[in-house]
Amino acid sequence: MLPSVPTQVPIFRRPLLALGFFLCAKLILAKAGGSFLLPAVTTGVPGKAAFWLLIPGVFLLLVITVTDFEQRLIFDDTTLPLAVFGLVHSIALSCAAASYAPLLKNLFAAVAGGLIFLTLAYLTRGGVGGGDVKLIAALGLWLGPERLTAVVCVGFFIGGLAALLLLLTGQKKRKDAFAYGPCFTLPAILALLTGIF
């Protein structure tokens, strides 16, 4: 069963939705030949396909950010399409480069990242959830090993800092659940759109 959708958008969700529209607008404007944040669209059908696939990818990452904030859950309804779009994106990149290297690297990142987080989920006994495992595997298909490693490191740093602040301010206790998903999705969006990592 799909999660219920609230009839009114919570006040803190509105900036995230506005950010999503802004990022998609930047993607569209970049097609004209590049912008402050984004490079120009690669020529050729595969390159253009890889570019336009960023739009559903970013949208799904924003949805995951919101749902994990709200419900402490990352749904298969979003991670599965994210993985599918990521696989198609990897194939398009390989076609544009006339090489299997991008696809193979991204597949390796997905498998390795998923296995590492699956191990963490077992060792932490629920500290890392199944949704986080699937999210990292899906991100591997988009980012490849180098950028996925950077995003995970940044995510752990941001998450650890945020958790520490919540503990120090008394808003969270040590055994309380903490939404780590946004700590990975937001750096991933930056990586996809700016090449910052």
Placement of each model-derived feature along the sequence:
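A membrane-topology feature that recognizes alpha-helical transmembrane segments
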Residues: 1-197
